Amino acid sequence: MEKQDITFNKNEDTMKLLISKMERKLAEIKLGGGKKSIEKHHAKGKLTARERIELLLDKDSPRQEIGAFVADGMYEEYGGCPSGGVVIKIGYVTGKQCIVVANDATVKAGAWFPIAAKKNLRAQEIAMENRLPIIYLVDSAGVFLPMQDEIFPDKE
């Protein structure tokens, strides 16, 4: 076996491990506030943000989540904020491509952390740049009060 083949195989193995780690992290992030929070949500007859988006988007149409890893490792002193507490997907509704933004009420009752405002602004930028309609599915407690002084309606 040549040195190039050994290097390739080593790089391939490393990449597979990284992809596996990323997929595990994404599965954890998609639980939002966690399994117990999802169960409480369902017990109230409510759907999660991702469930609501999936029901809205055209069945079997392409879709892409934006910013799933946003806020990873942030706000740990408050229990974390998976995906910034907001789920954003680009997909199709009745054949028209659009952006859907949904507060994740399993994360601190959908309250806005500073990063949620930035993520929402980014969704609006993408919508404007690509001339896409934007749909909001709001289920939010409002601003996360311990950090309310850090949330502004602009980019900075």
Which residues does each PLM region occupy?
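Terminal-region recognition feature
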Residues: 1-156
